[in-house]
Amino acid sequence: MKLVVTEKNDAAVKIADLLGAEKPTADKVFNTPVYRFDVDGEEWVTIGLRGHILEPDFTPSLIYKKRGGWSGVTAEGEALPAELPASLPTPPFKKKKPFTADGVELKGWKMEALPYLIYAPIEKLPKEKDIIRSLKNLAKKADSIVIATDFDREGELIGSDALSCCREVNTTAPVSRARYSAFTKPEITHAFANLVPMDDDLAAAGGSRRDIDLIWGAVLTRYLTLVKFAGYGNVRSSGRVQTPTLAIIVERERERMAFVPEDYWVIRGAFDAGAAAGPTPGEGPEAFEAPHATARFKVEAEANAAMDHVAGATSARVVSVEKKKRTVAPPVPFNTTSLMAAASAEGISPARCMRIAESLYMDGYISYPRVDNTVYPDSLDLAEVVNAIAGNPAYGPYCRELLSAGPLKATRGKTETTDHPPIYPTAKATPDDLSAADYKLYNLIARRFLATLSGPATVEGTKVTLDVAGEPFVAKGDVLVEPGFRAIYPYGLKKDETLPALGEGASVAFNGATC
């Protein structure tokens, strides 16, 4: 029997569905769902974990022996080696908490114990006992084991912990790793046809991060709480991520509190190129507005003086007309951070964005959404992805245009990793296939992918300087001349701000100004 270990139950279901010749048989082992199916006559079983099934914790106490030095003592009485700096006092101690005759108790929140807690051994304790029991039951009978957790640092650690549980009951079964970035039949089939060894270094990196979280969080949380409340009252939590984030928020809040608002005045003029002098109705395509060249007047008297100068004026002279084209490069592929930023601009919060993205990934619509990479790997068949989503009527014509234009070339971001590709669509979806919120995010991802394969956009900017009774006004407009990638990716695109045709030296109607 081949045992396949996944990170979540949904993944166990999906892999069984994609690999099994027939519909998998749902079963339970000690109340944990498992899925049985055959592959070429061999029985396979998939089991989903619940993320981490082991969690780190300090040993409850430390003891010191003159010949052996320091060691941590687990709840079961097992001694784990410990390395403490020579600067820390050693027994014999007076028996006053947290000290014992030959060591230090670490469970209680005592200030004196914190210097020792930093160096205490860390053990892994069962977090999901029922799942561990089920996993071991299956592992006993397994001829081979495939770890199919997410292929990233955290997934490798989760898989490594699961494997350690399996090894407690089966030390001989061959172990391999399935790496995949999407729940599609080609991707999963390829992953299981090209199994690789476990990446112990990647798992160790995940373990180091988790240990640092524990050391930082446990020691500093206790310290801050004890300093503030002498052991009483609310806990003052600290963490590797939350504390620096809090510092950023505090710094920004201090800037906000220190900000002294200043009054300013803005003057806007109304113009009409359809006449040489006003007043006119100020409507239609020839009408436009322009602010004073001094965008913000800091002195009220100066703003009033400018308003006095233009009071009664009915005409403005076009002093200059400047036109300049600029190229806007297509965007780079989505990683997690840029996806959350783009989704936030569309009204989807980061937390909701990741919930939806995880759901789309599990349903086979997008690739793995927790990535740093912004460079598509050479192994990704871009044309195949374009063809896969071309069935959506909203993208079909654009997809066909891309494919007919020649070899596809994608933009490249600054971050290139080898674990997962950037986020891209893996299957066609329409509004009929998904909920409104899910499709909104899918649509963003699909259009972004197509945009990364597209050419730049060209925008023509126009700047017109006008003179009204000696006061300068400046009108600006932008027009999308060559849509390029903007034809498929309209996000963040400003509406064309078209100015009427104006020539230097011409007179246009001035219909007054507001301040």
Where are these regions (language model features)?
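Long, highly charged, low-complexity internal segments
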Residues: G41-I47, G51-K124, G233-E358, R400, ...
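Intrinsically disordered, low-complexity regulatory segments
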Residues: M1-W216, E497-T498, N511-T514
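Active-site phosphate-binding and catalytic loops of NTP-dependent enzymes
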Residues: K23-K28, P174, P197-L202, R222-L226, ...
